[in-house]
A protein has these predicted regions:
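Non-heme Fe(II) oxygenase metal-center motifs and adjacent flexible, charged/small-residue loops
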Residues: 1-216
Length: 216
């Protein structure tokens, strides 16, 4: 997408439906972006970003951290949630009130009124980093939605179906966009195409993504 086309996108908040139970709340958190990023800095000072290793032994291109009662971790033993940060050997930082309120309100806006996350995965993308198509299925209660908040550089989000080979929608996510999916779309495959280099007044050379989940 060229900058000319980017400039032509609507600047007021608007809702885009991806599938039943899945929407993008465009610009929903844009006005809070700097404050949200300040929370991210505080969290990752206590629980630094790191590149996790997949069960197959590959280093993920996206740097990760967590906050909440549990955090998502990966190593050669598998994917799982842990109450202890394996890097610091301490509990993860609590989800800040501002982040919690944003996640709950966005879920309600998308039609999920009972969402109360206990985990927030923080992903940091640099130029070239990506997230391959995958399902979020490590949570015990799949009736709860996923809430995903974008900060910083724009990225192309892929949202597919229940099978990996299903055709994917491609959506440009910019700062403050919030994707919410649940219900019949809860296990849909999704991912992020390689990030293009750029500069954000909020996050510098990075894209930050906050993914809120109810794990238990």
């Amino acid at each position: 997408m060229t900058m000319d086309l980017f400039d032509q996108l609507p600047h007021d908040p608007w809702i885009e439906t991806l599938a039943p139970g899945a929407v993008v709340l465009h610009h929903y958190a844009r006005q809070q972006a700097a404050l949200l990023f300040a929370d991210v800095i505080a969290i990752t000072t206590a629980a630094p970003f790191r590149h996790l290793i997949t069960p197959g032994g590959y280093r993920m291109s996206v740097a990760m951290s967590n906050c909440g009662q549990v955090g998502w971790v990966s190593d050669k033993q598998g994917y799982r949630y842990s109450s202890i940060d394996p890097l610091t050997e301490k509990s993860w930082p609590a989800i800040p009130a501002r982040l919690m309120t944003l996640a709950v309100d966005a879920a309600q806006q998308a039609g999920f009124s009972q969402f109360e996350p206990d985990a927030c995965l923080i992903n940091r993308y640099e130029a070239g980093a990506k997230l391959s198509l995958h399902q979020d299925k490590d949570e015990l209660d799949l009736r709860q939605p996923i809430v995903s908040v974008s900060l910083g550089l724009a990225a192309v989000f892929q949202f597919g179906g229940l099978a990996r080979e299903a055709k994917c929608l491609r959506v440009l996510l910019t700062e403050g966009d919030v994707v919410v999916w649940g219900g019949p779309s809860r296990l849909n495959y999704h991912g992020v195409l390689p990030l293009k280099a750029g500069f954000s007044a909020t996050t510098g050379a990075y894209r930050i993504n906050l993914t809120f989940r109810r794990t238990r």
